[in-house]
Each structure stands twice: as structure tokens, then as C-alpha cells.
Amino acid sequence: MRRWHWAAVGLAALASLLAVLALFIDLPGAGSPAGGRQARAAIAGQLAALGDENTSFSVQNTGIDPARFVVDYYDADGTRLTEDTIPDVPAGASVAFHQDNQEGLPQGFSGSAVVTSDQSVRTVILKQIDKGNGVLSAGGDDGVTRGFSKIYLPLIYSRYGPDEGWNTRLILQNISSGATACVRMTYRNEEGQVALVEPGAGGQLQPQCPQGGLLVAAGSVLEQDHAEMAGSLPANFQGSLVVELVTGEEESVVDTQILAATVDVYHSQRASFATYRGLGWSPSEGVGDLSTGVYLPLVHKNAGEGGGWNTRFFVSPVDPAEPAELTLFYCCDSRLPGGGGSLERKTTVTTWGIVDPAQDAGLPDGFEGSLRIVSDEAVAVVATWSWVLGGVDTFAAYTGVPQAEASTAVWVPLLYRDFGYKGPTGEARGWNSWLRVQVTDGGTASVRITYHGSDLPGGSASFSEDVTGAKFFVQTEDPLLPAGFEGAAVIVSDKPVAVLAGVSSDAYQGDTDAMFTAFGPDVQATPPGSLLTISLAQGWTHTCYVGIQQSVDVALADALGEVLAVYRLRADQGYDRWFAGRPELSTLTTLNPNDALLILASAGATWVQELPGTPPTFATLVPGWNSTCYGGLTKAVELATAEIDGQFSVLYSLGANQSWRRYVPDRPELSTIMVIDQNSALLILKSTPGNVAWAFQP
């Protein structure tokens, strides 16, 4: 059984490949949020004997049109086992896939899945480990939307701690459907020294890896349990791992962006468990999850009743040979000496480092705040959160939010209020969630949170509130949400925010806390030569042309067989038109860069255009109707249109279902557009005299 979660829309329509990592099916148990649904038992071994493991993942359509999800499941050797297809997923909706309910997966399945969609998608993965006797461990992390040639894993344990109980396990996936991956793994200890390189020098080369490296076949998964590496890593090991492709000179950049990974952190004698996504980097492009600006929305020092909650974070610089100079800005506590209740610290991280706020005498006990990291080198950051006084197994981890992911529009695919299993006596509340919103500049932001779920009247409910520094929003306490709520949220702000989400259940003993960071818009490099893929609907499509000036026939070459007519609105409110095979009726002969076009097609088609090296910086609006291409970055509609505030009455966007969405300034009850995507075609009614230049701000 799958439930639909309704969420906000807004990202540009594009083909998106999402690798979902480390999937298991063992014993359904009551541990899953879907506990109580019919599921078959499947008992077998796992990567590590932590208990009866299961995973689930929720996939959200963050595009503007209905999506088709195709889920392909692969075993650890890359063999495709089964497929699950969900057609016509509405824009903004999300589907939960529970592996314990997937009849096509064998007992004891341990592998991976790849979701393919014709719309942009986002995913959250939850792992549940039933340890028996009502004890549960849970962890969560974000799914990936692209592969990389290099993966940074800043936190690795092998038999660490006084009882040698802390360990990690690695699940590395080759997300390619055809390219073999040959990988090198470099472990560094807490002094930053190389502790292990796999494969070691002098070993026999595998035929598929003539340049060296461990073989990871296309679509397959490489698994390592660091508790079992006594012969390779020393006892009490704490450090980091970098996984990188070993490539030949003839391989292209595209062929090497094929790695994704996740790490589970666990204690072998307790229920403590967490998981985090590996942070990817593309050296050839200089882009990825590492950043010179990183945000941590939740930081504790001896906080909570009893003073046991603490946060630590682990840092890996992009280049181990170049130390990273970090400036840390803690916020916001009136006891701190800086402006707005802040504290600034400086530190240097060479090849690897730990920052422990509990050891900073300048931070007062009971501190609950946020942290902004500024570095002169790109860094990967993972934070852990736990109760350090003993007797409580709660442990969670999350990746720091890179600067490019902080946004004025943020998506949260999964939230709960009093959902699911209520414990053996039925008196527990079940699964619940919270949001932690951090204003990136430490100031005050006006934030609107819209919940979306099938249990809400009309499918959504929203409220607005100011956030200074950082703030919790706890769904258990929110009167807008009914008991049994399972859904999603979109957060729109007048300043960029970084958002952390968490879920937990009081129906079990153990460690049910899981954390994941929310999603900003797609952030991808678009150098000259990059392509923009437009899906033309059967019927009308309002779209942008971003290519060079050329004839209509040449510009539309990819889709010429399906296009019946093209219209372009003029400033005098008339239309230039082009009809297939009817030059005597056509007045439109040439397309110009950033033309907004109404295209009538006899069938669905794909139109591929080459993006310009420099996007447009403004568009001129005239009194009356304007058919305009928006060239700015993806933003909340209020921010995207801030330059023309007061100049227009309504803005429309046409969906593939032939219906118009609208934005009416200061009328949220009438508005159905929340975000404007880059390269969107818009119909705007300018209601003031004279022309105005709409400048697209970065």
C-alpha cells in the first residue's frame, strides 16, 4: 500500500535520476511508520547483524507537471530484480515505497534502487532496525540526485570507544547503468595521517580496472562493515574516508560522475544508530556538496534537562594537502558577547578535524543555537547529536547544508503528527516530526510554512511567522495538523534559510530519532554547451526558447514532426504565428533568444536546446499582457517578482495538464504558484502605465 503526500511544487521540469541507497528487507515488525499495514515476513542476514532491518523511501514530485516514477531494484551485484511503476503522480505529490511491502523483492534483500522520473524529484530514506522486545533503531538521510567522481565521508569508526562499540558501515553505489567503476579508498585517522589505502600497492590488477582500483560493476553496490576490518584498521579508529574513481585519460567527465554513498553509524552493544549521505565532489567541474559556506541549524552544548544533549561536527577539506581556515559563527543566545547574541571562533583543519562545542568555554552550558561555517577551502561537514551522560541511546547525524542549498524556497518531503503504531498499550502518540529553520545571515526572516496532506481540508494548511536566528516548529504542537497526519511541507522565506527535519516515535524503546536536511532548488553548473530539455505536452505548452537566433524550422528541429503551431505575443497585444507546412499563413519566421512561446503539439515531444553561457539579466514589460521568460534563479514567487512589485496584477503559468496556475500579489488565498523556476515562461498582466525593466537578481 502507498499513501500520497501532497507537497508544494516549483522546480523546473526536467528528467531526473535519483539513486536511492542501502535498501533492506528483513522482518516487517512494528518498527516501520507503516507498521500495521499488511507485509510479508522475510528473515535473512544483513550487512551487519544489527537486528531485523527494513528501509522505506518517499519520492516527491517537485516538478510542475504530473510525473511518472519508475523504480528499478538491484541486488548487490547490480542485477535488476524487479520494477515498480507509478504513473500520473500529481505535481507536488509524493509516494512512499516500503520495501517490506514490495512483493517482487526476495527474502533477505540487500541492495539498491534507482528512481527515474520525467520531473524533478526529491527523496528521504528511512531505515528501521527492530532489535526485539520493543527496541527500535532508526536513521534517515537524503537521497541523491546525481553521482560524483569523488565522495567524502567525514565520520568513520572501527571498534571505537572504551568498549570498542562504535562502528560504521559503508554502502557505495555505482549509479551508472553501463559504466564500470574502479575506486580507490583512502582512510585517514584523527591525526590526519593515511591509515589505509584500498586496494594496496602491489596487488594484482583486475582486468576491468587496468589503472587499478576496486571493481564496482554498473548498478551494483560495494558494502563494507568497519567492525570487521581488524586486520586493516587499528582498534579505536576514528577518522575519515575518501572514495574516488580511478580513471583513464580517455574517459569523459560524464562517464565518471557515477558514485554515491551512505554511511551507517552504530553501536554494537546499544540501540544507538544514525545514517548520513556521502558528500560528493566533481573536481573537473569544481561543484558538489562541499562548500566554503556551511550551515548547521541545530547545535547543543550540555542542553536540555540534565544537560546531556550535545552536538559535534566532523570536517574534511576538499584537498588534504591544503589546510582549511574556518571561521565559526555561533548564534543566537543573549549570553554570547557578539551582536545579536553571537560568538565568533577561528580554527584550522588540516586533513581532518573535529569541532566539539562542549569543549568551548566561551559557549555557556544549555546553549541551543545554530552555526555558520565560513572556510577558505571547500569542506565536507557531518554533525552528530546525542545524549552524552549515559542511559539514553538516542543518536542522530546530519550533513551540513552547503551555501548553495540554502534558499528562499525549501521542500520537506516527509512530516508526521501522531502517526502509525501507538505501542503495545495503544497509549503512545506514535511518529512525530519537527523542523528547525535557520536564517543564514543570523537575522530575522518572515517565513511561511505550508503543510500538504490528504488529511487536510483542501489538501493544505499554512501559517506565517518571523524567525530570528533559528527556531523549532514542532508538528506535535501544531493545531493545523490532525492526529494521524502524514504529509509534507514547503517553506518560503524572504531570506535564504537552511532547514533540518527530524522524525521520532515514542512507541518504542531504543533510538527512534532520525534527521535529514530539507531541499532547496536544483543547483547545477550550466557552462556553455549545457542543454535544456523541454517536454512539450500534447496540446498547448507555454515555454521559453533560450538558443541563438535562427529560423523556426531549425530551432524546432527536434520536435518539428509534432509541432502544429507556434505563437509569440507582441507588445501591441497581437500575435506573431507559425503554422507547420503553411508558410503563406505564417508571420513568425525567426526565433530570438528568450522568446516566450505558446506551442501547439499533436503529441508529446522532447525539445532540446543549448543554454547560453550568460543568462538574460532583465526582461522589459509593457502595459497589458506580457509573455515573458524568467531568467533569474529559482525563487519564491514574492522574491522573484520583488523588482516589479506593484507593477502587475496577476501572473500565470501553464501546466502540462492544460490548466493555468496563478499568483495574485497579496492574495495567498487566490494564488497557486509559490515558486518560479529559471527559464519559466510566464503570462503577466502589467497594470501600470509605461514600460518597466524586470531585473533578474541572483
Question: Regions from the language model: what does each represent?
Answer:
Residues 11-20:
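Hydrophobic membrane-insertion alpha-helices, especially the h-region
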